[in-house]
């Protein structure tokens, strides 16, 4: 009889929301039968609501009705599937406890992002110690305490949330970021015919990204052209102002097919350069996405990146929030195209070794063994993705 995991929650699907699809792919590659019990998440509305705290009560009330719909179908789904474990995907803060009360199987919560970290420390929407900040910390703690196991994306983030909540360290685990849309093959890296390095940035422009640091660095290096997809409106204006013809400002969002075209046309992909503590703890999805596409990356020098990629030869680093150091690295790379070509040739192999589907499957086996050791103790055989 196969091992079964039920995904239950209100997560987002589609372009821009790879996390839950990644986790499902990893489970399936580990030989797990996966079922779902889901209502739609908030999607891109989350970004607007985060910036407008006065909308939080109404958003909570609307989500409450979705939660009731979800719970109405959960009992029947559990009876049908009889899961050996339940995963509550991100965002699931408001669902973990209620789901846990309604299922007999152990429950894992893919926290992915701390509410406190996102709103207080990274985006600085409210001050530490304020009523809202304290409430967000309480939300994080309540959600984590309800789950049998809490999953983050890096060991550094797992340690951060453990410290924030004060819960035992053995309640936390990590599953790496992974590209669920990685193509089976990559386009060969082509050296620039005009000597101009094509640098690609894509992202929402949250403080973690440090986009203005990147723009200021590119302004100092005449041999770099920036293609900018996303970013906040003031950052897009700033890029046009200081870079002129050396920037192509694209849409605020592109689908996966267009993003792949942009990756194929790039020589180097920009990661994150922000000054918040969160920068030190993440391996950004854009880094993983770029490596999967066979493109080298430049990003902030952080413990999280160094843990996996120090010495890999495919990721180049600069000091976080330091446009001067970043400019020096860009200048060096634009003058050493052979090094970039070599890095590009190795990038997909590095992705496969550290972030590929089989690596995620192996991590899942370890996590499931912790979650339900009696059921999953025999599930460590090799499985082909």
Explain the meaning of each model-derived region.
Residues 32, 171-172, 178-196, 210:
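Acidic anion/phosphate-binding donor-loop and adjacent secondary structure
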Residues 311-324, 332-338:
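Conserved acidic donor-binding segment of nucleotide-sugar-dependent glycosyltransferases
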Residues 196, 236-268:
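Nucleotide-activated donor-binding/catalytic signature segment of Leloir-type glycosyltransferases, i.e.
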Residues 209, 253-262, 267-289, 299-307:
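Nucleotide-sugar-dependent
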Residues 156, 177-178:
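Carbohydrate-associated surface elements
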Residues 190-209, 215-221, 226-227:
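Conserved donor-binding/catalytic core segment of Leloir-type glycosyltransferases
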Residues 130-150:
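Membrane-proximal helix-turn-helix segments that form the acceptor-binding/catalytic region
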Residues 188, 335-369:
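A charged, aromatic-enriched C-terminal amphipathic alpha-helix characteristic of glycosyltransferases
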């Amino acid at each position: 009889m196969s091992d079964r995991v039920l995904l239950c929650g209100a997560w987002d699907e589609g372009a821009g929301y790879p996390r839950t699809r990644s986790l499902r792919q990893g489970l399936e590659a580990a030989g797990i039968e996966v079922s779902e019990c889901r209502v739609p998440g908030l999607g891109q509305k989350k970004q607007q609501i985060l910036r407008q705290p006065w909308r939080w009560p109404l958003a909570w009330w609307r989500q409450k009705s979705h939660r009731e719909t979800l719970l109405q179908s959960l009992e029947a789904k559990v009876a049908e599937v009889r899961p050996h474990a339940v995963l509550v995907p991100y965002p699931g803060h408001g669902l973990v406890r209620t789901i846990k009360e309604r299922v007999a199987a152990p429950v894992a919560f893919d926290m992915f992002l701390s509410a406190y970290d996102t709103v207080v420390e990274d985006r600085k929407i409210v001050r530490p110690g304020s009523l809202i900040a304290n409430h967000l910390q309480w939300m994080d703690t309540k959600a984590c305490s309800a789950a049998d196991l809490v999953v983050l994306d890096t060991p550094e983030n797992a340690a951060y949330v453990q410290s924030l909540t004060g819960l035992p360290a053995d309640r936390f685990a990590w599953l790496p970021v992974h590209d669920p849309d990685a193509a089976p093959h990559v386009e060969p890296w082509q050296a620039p015919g005009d000597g101009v390095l094509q640098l690609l940035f894509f992202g929402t422009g949250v403080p973690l990204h440090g986009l203005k640091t990147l723009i200021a660095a590119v302004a100092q290096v005449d041999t770099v052209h920036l293609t900018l997809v996303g970013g906040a409106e003031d950052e897009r204006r700033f890029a046009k102002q200081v870079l002129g013809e050396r920037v192509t400002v694209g849409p605020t969002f592109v689908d996966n097919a267009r993003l792949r075209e942009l990756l194929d046309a790039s020589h180097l992909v920009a990661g994150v350069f922000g000054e918040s503590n969160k920068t030190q703890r993440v391996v950004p999805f854009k880094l993983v996405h770029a490596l999967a596409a066979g493109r080298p990356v430049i990003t902030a020098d952080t413990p999280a990146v160094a843990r996996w990629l120090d010495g890999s030869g495919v990721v180049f680093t600069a000091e976080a929030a330091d446009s001067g150091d970043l400019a020096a690295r860009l200048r060096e790379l634009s003058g050493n195209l052979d090094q970039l070509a070599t890095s590009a040739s190795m990038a997909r192999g590095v992705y496969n070794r550290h972030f590929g589907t089989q690596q995620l499957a192996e991590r899942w086996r370890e996590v499931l063994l912790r979650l339900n050791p009696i059921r999953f103790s025999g599930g460590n055989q090799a499985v082909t993705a």
